[in-house]
Amino acid sequence: MRRFILSIAFGLAASSVHAADWDRFLQAVFGAAAAKDGSVCYARVYDAGHLAANKAQRIRDVAIKLTLRTENGERRLDHNVVTHLVGSRQKYWSGGQCGDYRGLVARCFVEGDGGAADFTLDSDGKTLTARFDDFHIWRPQDAADETTMTFDKSPADKVAKLTKAPMSACAGVGD
């Protein structure tokens, strides 16, 4: 009986820590708007100098939209990513849900077992560092083509540091 009570107490403590981390992450991203549904955009466009100095990098630009929504009474955080590769006008995108929060870090997964990313915020939520882990992207222009590619194949594409941007920077990321 004592073990049972201890396991319940531990579970409740872990649940409240998880809820506190969820709240802290949402507060950093959305600020006062964390109480309602909405979206925020983070973006980065790599300039020619950066790309010349990092020849192994394939990612030319990246935008990440985080969307807080309520569905069937449950709140959730979705992510959508849009990117272009160096030398290509083709747009690629990806998306899924975030589900594990540790302080200012959210673990976010791509739908259909397409990898994951850790999104780490600075304390004021103005900068997001994305660490990609076998993160899959695909082409939205051709819905019939479900071919995916791994976003972070090159070690130079494993980490991206983005800044909060106007929602127009996330145009075309899907929803």
Language-model region placement:
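Surface-exposed, polar helix/loop patches in the mature regions of secreted/periplasmic/lumenal proteins
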Residues: V86-R139
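Ser/Thr- (and often Asn-) enriched beta-sheet segments in non-cytosolic proteins
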Residues: R58, A63-T67, R76-V82, R107-F109, ...
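N-terminal secretory signal peptides
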Residues: A20-Q97, Y101
